[in-house]
Amino acid sequence: VNIVLSVVLGVLGVALDAVGLLGLQGKLRRNRFVGVRTAAALRDEETFALANRVAGVPNVAAGAVAIVSGTMAFVMADLAVTAGIIGLVGALTIAFAGGIAGSRAAALVPEPVKPKGCGGCACGGGGCSPLAGL
């Protein structure tokens, strides 16, 4: 039991550390699988990068907690399940809090301004023509 628990926590820790470091460096691109994936964060690349930069430090900390608790579960055979559960809950709580912070940061970014002007063929009366203002 303690070997499986240690491996699961170790893999979770490495994954959280990798996502956190990529987020901190701004190298995590929008995707469907990892990172802060709220509607506000997925609006554009810059907002996604900001949200994951904010969530990066908590994700790295959560990864460290998972790795340390996995190591403790391996070393302390009699308390492996207790150390593993406490570490898992702690790591997921820290990662979740980081995701909330990243989501809130993304929500504070104003919507990008859309260019004004004609959006297609619906401009009647020469509205899109350079001579329309004459």
Where are these regions (language model features)?
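N-terminal leader/targeting segments and the first structural element of proteins
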Residues: 1-61
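Alpha-helical transmembrane segments of multipass membrane proteins
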Residues: 67-72
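Cysteine-cluster motifs in flexible loop/terminal segments that predominantly coordinate metals
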Residues: 113-134
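Short helix-capping/hinge motifs at transmembrane helix termini and TM-loop junctions
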Residues: 26, 76-78
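Juxtamembrane cytosolic interface motif at the C-terminal end of transmembrane helices
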Residues: 22-23, 73, 100-101
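Hydrophobic alpha-helical transmembrane segments
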Residues: 1-9, 80-90
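Alpha-helical transmembrane segments and their immediate juxtamembrane interface regions
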Residues: 85-117
